[in-house]
A protein has these predicted regions:
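Non-catalytic accessory regions of SAM-dependent methyltransferases
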Residues: 1-43
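Non-catalytic substrate-recognition/targeting regions of SAM-dependent transferases
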Residues: 27-40, 56-119, 127
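Conserved class I S-adenosyl-L-methionine
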Residues: 135-144
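Conserved SAM-binding loop of SAM-dependent methyltransferases across substrates and taxa
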Residues: 145-157
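Conserved SAM-binding motif I beta-strand of class I
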Residues: 159-164
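S-adenosyl-L-methionine
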Residues: 166-212
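S-adenosylmethionine
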Residues: 194-269
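C-terminal catalytic and target-recognition region of SAM-dependent MTase-like enzymes
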Residues: 248-307
């Protein structure tokens, strides 16, 4: 199939999302018949990720097609070859822009590494979790730019604690809070290791109604390493020690070697005396067709209500 036809078909498939957001994945690799090609739209900014060399020679063509199909203020191509990230800007402009999602605003920066400030695949999960946050005390671990925390505040949470080891990303989170008219409390943004914070919370008997955990596959901080496949059960067990009765846990990973079934096994090993009332498997949003069939588009998540 001609490339223009493939791209147009992929874009049309996502037309219904226009009512709730102006940032979405336009092309999701082989899920859209374009194995090795990812295209994300952030309002009128476009990011193209090239994961296979066959697309490398066609990036100019891809850019021209996209610019002819929609308003584009800025277009950047990111090619991943092993651990190296090669960046090429094909339409110059300000790499920063403000996007909207379910009535909330977020600033993103497409020239800030591979992740620009908002994980698009988590859109529906953010809305789902936030809908349960009214009048609740919420803990958001591995918070990145705190999109879950911002949603929780928007939906009426009485208290939110966001933790992340990166002071820089938490500063971006504070900017997003202000962008949406929320006052920024320094107590709400804690630059710390999430596991360390949870261990302190256990000692202080600092309990939460809702806990959100979306850890990285691997991280290193102050000489300690976190490996999600090794450490997820301990992380969940510690979190459950400070989850109130009738509380809810959202836990997810984009590590392609952990399936939903394996994540459920990790949860089961971590329960101790806790009992599950309801468990729901969740994944990436609808603009990620083919999700979990290839490692570049992967998310296993659980939304759990406890007795």
């Amino acid at each position: 199939m001609e490339l223009r036809t493939l791209l147009n078909k992929a874009i049309e498939r996502r037309h219904s999302l226009a009512a709730i957001t102006n940032c979405l994945r336009l092309v999701n690799g082989k899920g859209d018949g374009c194995d090795g090609l990812l295209i994300d739209r952030y309002h009128q900014h476009v990011q193209v990720q090239v994961l296979h060399e066959r697309w490398s020679k066609r990036v100019d063509e891809i850019a021209q097609i996209l610019i002819s199909m929609m308003p584009v203020d800025y277009l950047i191509v990111k090619s991943r070859q092993g651990l190296d990230l090669n960046v090429k800007v094909l339409k110059q402009g300000d790499p920063k822009t403000i996007v909207e999602e379910n009535g909330l605003k977020f600033e993103v920066d497409l020239n800030d590494g591979l992740n620009c400030g908002l994980f698009l695949d988590m859109r529906e999960n953010r809305r789902m979790v936030a809908a349960a946050c009214k009048t609740k005390k919420v803990f958001n671990g591995f918070a990145y730019t705190c999109s879950f925390g911002l949603y929780a505040r928007h939906y009426g949470a009485t208290e939110v604690i966001n933790t992340d080891i990166s002071k820089r990303t938490l500063k971006k989170a504070e900017d997003n809070y202000r962008l949406n008219g929320f006052e920024v409390s320094k107590d709400e943004f804690v630059t710390t290791d999430t596991m360390a914070y949870l261990n302190r919370a256990v000692k202080k008997e600092n309990f939460f109604d809702i806990i959100i955990l979306d850890p990285p596959s691997f991280s290193r901080h102050e000489g300690k390493t976190f490996q999600v496949k090794r450490d997820m059960p301990v992380l969940i067990r510690t979190a459950l020690e400070v989850l109130r009765p009738k509380g809810r846990l959202f836990v997810s990973t984009n590590y392609s070697e952990i399936s939903h079934a394996q994540l459920e096994e990790m949860l089961a090993k971590s329960l101790n005396t806790r009992r599950v009332e309801k468990l729901e498997r969740v994944g990436q949003d609808q603009d990620f067709p083919g999700s979990n069939s290839f490692k570049e588009s992967y998310l296993s998540g659980l939304w759990v209500k406890f007795l």
